[in-house]
Each structure stands twice: as C-alpha cells, then as structure tokens.
Amino acid sequence: MKLKSISCKNFNFHKKFSKSLKENQKNILKNKTIVPAKLPISQPYWLEKPSSLGAYNVDSLQLIGRAENNPSAEFLISVEVGDATIDYRRPLIFKWNDPVKGEQNKNWIVCPKVTANIDQKVMIFSNESAQKILVTVVAHSANQKGDINIIHPQGWKVEGPTEYSLKTVDQELVLEYFISPNKNANSGVLKVQINGVDAHAMNTIVYDHITEQRWFPKSELQLVHLNLNTVPKKIGYLMGAGDLVDQHLKILKYYINQISTKDLTLKDLKNYDVVITGVRFFNVEEKAPYIANLLLKYVSQGGNLIVQYNTSYRLKTKNFYPYPLQISRDRVTQEDAQVTFLNDSHPVMNFPNKLTKNDFNNWVQERGLYFPNAWSKDYQPIFSWNDFNEEPKKGSLLIAKYGKGYYTYTGISFFRQLPAGVSGAYKLLVNIISLNND
C-alpha cells in the first residue's frame, strides 16, 4: 500500500507522495499551508439566511435534512492498493487529551475575526430613562482593532465607546453603553457594527454527549418603547412553577413584591391593591386550599385578583374560583390567530388604555393555553380566537365581579409575551391590573 496524495480544496492544498505504508504503523506527515483569509464562517446552514415564521430558508436541496454542516475543511487522501486507487475523505478536527475524559475532539471551524455579544436580547422602556447594555468583544485573531458603532432606530440615544483594540487571540473587552429613547421613539432593532460591517455574536453549546456546537447570530437586540398609561398600584405576586411576569411588571414602575405563603394572612393580602398568582400556582402550592380561601376573601373585600393558567391535572385544590368554571386543555397555538372582541365596553378594553386589534399583532409562540371551556354566567368572556379549522375558544380571559372586588382567570401567555417585549400584551395586563380602580 502506498500513499499517493493529500489534498484539501478548502485550503487550495495538494501534495503528492510516493510513500509505502506498513501495516499498523503510524505515519506523521508535517506540512505547512496558508488558510485562505476569505473562508466563509462556519454558520449552520439553516441559519445562514433569515427564517420565516416556523420555517428555515435553505437554498440547497442537498443540505436539507442534514443534522450538521459539511466539514469546514475536508482532506482527500489517495492511497494505492495493488492496481487500485482508493480515496478517503476525512474532516479536519482538533484532538486533545483530557486527564479525566481521555481523548477529546471537536470540529475545526471558521470564526469571524471579532465577535460582539450583547448581554440582552430585548430591552423594554416605559419612560425616557437610560438603561445599560454590555457588549463583549472577543478577538479570534491577533491584533484586532478599529471602530465599533451602535446602529439604532430613530428617536434613540446611545452613549459609549466607539473604538476597540485587542492584541491576543481570545482576549475579551467588555464595553458599556447607555441607551435611552425620546418620547416619540419607535420600537426597533439595535445593531453592533465593527469597522462598518454588521457584527456577529458567537454562541456555544457544550455537552459530553454531542459534538461542540457554535453558531454566529447577528449582534443585535430588540428595543421596545412602551407607549401606555398606567395607574399606580401596589402588587403582590405569588410565584407558581416559575415565570418572569413580576420582573417585567417592574419595568412599568409598579411597586411589586413576591409574597411568601408562609404564615400568610388576609391582613397581609390587604396591603396590596392587586394580587397575581404565577403560572400553575395551584398545581404546585402545598398550602393551596388555605391560600385559595384567603384570596377569595381578599377579593370579596375589594381586592383585585389575577389568576394565571393552571392545569386540571394534579391541582392542589379545585376551590380557587368564586363561581364554577371548568379548566380544559383548550389552547390557541397560532400566535397570529385572529382575535374577536366579545365585549368592547368592558373596562378591561378601555382603561387606562384603549385596546385595538393592533395590540394583538406580533405575539410570540401562542395566544394561550389551558383555557376554561365551561363557566358560570357570572364570568364575562372578553376574547374569542381559535387555531385554523378549530372551534372558537372564548375562555382565555374571564372576569367576574365578586363582592367588592374583581376576579380574573386567564390562560393568556403573559409569561411568554412580556419577556419578548410584546407591547399589546403589556397594555392588556396593565388594564387587568387597573380593574377596580374606583
């Protein structure tokens, strides 16, 4: 057996040999080559172009269905066996020995010379106060320096560094920027540019059971300027299975406090204008029967209670509503499902913000889940919507007057919409919070 040649189209490398290969004998061949400067970065093929809703945009039919990219560099090794020539294709990989795990390897990939990761994906502004972002600039090649600029929509102001300098590979530089809108600023996308070109971030996934994964999204974030009215309220939040609704309500300058269920009393609840239960609170709270009784007393004496979705399976109590309702598995998974207003004159549709169909544009992932499918006439349904070819679902938002207060049960996915900066969802939740304002 003889080695005839080794070549790599990615590197414009080709070298001929006439070397005999002996059985089970290692051969180490050392050669130098220059890696072309304009190799494309190793972006997963399905992320190279912007995607549409629910679908990636891939031009090459040969790539569709592949679990990963073709190798960024692949060598063709030709050997002669008798009268036949056999070609082997081998990807370029990096190998090393870990003292615990033994031999490790990962794919050789092409990175941008410099990446810029922003510490947030969405920034939400309810006023003109400045907020801070951190941009981590990393060199993947030595001696990188130049201009760095923040490109932003009209009506926004950005203050921060305009230059960077990195001498060594993997050197990091964390830059602070302060961003603020004027009163007429529109929501939009903020981008980082390096030397006049849109920058990429670099994200990495590392697990023992899969090959290390890296991808390079555009270095950008969504700026959301909320144009809405609020009524000052003191809000208590009873955390359920875990969500970030309370944290995002703080953006609106509400006083909001997470309530502990330990030793909770009706007197404690009456310190709040509004009490909100987190998602699946009555599925996970061990003291649910006692807490539910307190909450209904709180409502009857003038409180405003907002109960976010629970599932009918493994409820800790079924007595957390003032009038009968039946939780189902009804949901609307199409985030753009058309909404029908069932009661335009209801306060939740009008105060302190007038809701329109435009407020239900640009929602993410779904409208909501686990809607009731039967309820007492004491509840007022507010919306109707449905997935394609399904019956209308009217149980997403049910509001009832109970004693001196208001009780709201909702399966609307505020826990998804608020972190995504969906302004219409903020407006709707603000209106629910503002019930019982008299």
Per-region residue spans from a language model:
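Catalytic beta-strand/loop cores that center a nucleophilic Ser/Cys/Thr
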Residues: 331-421, 437
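Stable alpha-helical elements in mature extracytoplasmic
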Residues: 245, 278, 291-294, 425-429
